[in-house]
Amino acid sequence: MKDSFLFTSESVTEGHPDKMADQISDAVLDYIIERDQKAKVACETLVSNGFCMITGELKTSVYAPMQEIAREVVKKIGYTDALYGFDYRSAAVLNGVGEQSPDINQGVDREDGEIGAGDQGLMFGYACKETETLMPLPIHLAHQLTFALAQKRKDNTLPFLRPDGKSQVSVRYENNKPVSIDTIVISTQHSPEVSQKHLKEAVIEEIVYKVLSKEYLHDNIKFFVNPTGKFVIGGPQGDAGLTGRKIIVDTYGGSCPHGGGAFSGKDPSKVDRSAAYAARYVAKNLVASGVCDKATVQLAYAIGVIEPVSIYVNTHNTSKYSSAELEKCVKSVFKLTPKGIIESLDLLRPIYSLTSAYGHFGRELEEFTWEKTNKAEEIKAFFKR
């Protein structure tokens, strides 16, 4: 008897209010880190009806023009008219950023050149063989749909689309392997002139069938396109947006646990971000090496402490090696101190705006060093000793 179940993940477009906030926070981080690699940045953003507020804590010698940075991000996303729910020209931008607490900084910057963790916390990484990029299929498909919504809007293929939007994909699994798409939900902001019928047909034909792999498509997929019937009011006019509210979209779509820490606006001394990237790097290389088909990796840190307080590897019964053996391998092959992570993944670069929409993982861009599988051979060699 087949073990059959559905698993669902969602994604949001770059014009979703929470993603707007993430992108502004990461644009501020990129501006500062490009000019001051020793900077400590924790930038939070709120967007609401007609205004944006940037807050958080900094330790840097760099002046960051917050208004200009925020307006440029919003313009690039496509909020160029108040009718869309936000206008980069007329929106108020408020700056409430303060200085980083010296109590925190004394535990991070060490006289010996090492870096203590910027906070306590636990971070997870995950990899599996469901896609070529070793990501779970549901979140992979959901990101493909939201990215296509933005691209078809920007290239004027579907000129009635507006920036805000979401997708959700339910995938059927049999014996723990994905076999087909069961349900697709797409909610997209649109101009008031377009009919619901035309919108649904265009989205299915131009986005779903032209973007998703035919391997998982079939005639009986259930489609829900703007199921409420209308989505004209969107962006920050429809909902307020905050940095760090799309942590499952940013990671694995719910396929593995999440430690709770958000990424955007945080420099890599914050292990919420850098150690989550490292955990993905570890998990992906374990799977790529062939020692397992699936891996969940947990790292945990204490504020001001250099080494992780714990490392845990779960291969979900897909490896002949025990968790203890795999953890010993991870400690041997990977540098998992904050400094080791920053140096091995080259994280002191202005790369973070690229991460702030459509997922931090599974996108094999040159800048995303945590997606490389250059440790796979070392892992193989470890188990041949």
UniProtKB/Swiss-Prot annotation:
InterPro entries this protein is in?
ADOMET_SYNTHASE_CS, S-AdoMet_synt_C, S-AdoMet_synt_central, S-AdoMet_synt_N, S-AdoMet_synthetase, S-AdoMet_synthetase_sfam
Residues annotated for Mg(2+) binding in this entry: 18
Using the UniProt annotation, give all residue ranges assigned to the region (Flexible loop): 100-110
Q: Does the keyword Magnesium apply?
A: yes
What job does this protein perform?
A: Catalyzes the formation of S-adenosylmethionine (AdoMet) from methionine and ATP. The overall synthetic reaction is composed of two sequential steps, AdoMet formation and the subsequent tripolyphosphate hydrolysis which occurs prior to release of AdoMet from the enzyme.
PANTHER family linked to this entry: S-ADENOSYLMETHIONINE SYNTHETASE (PTHR11964)
Q: How does it assemble?
A: Homotetramer; dimer of dimers.
State what protein this is by name: S-adenosylmethionine synthase
Task: Tell me which species this is from.
Answer: Helicobacter pylori (strain ATCC 700392 / 26695)
- Gene behind this protein: metK
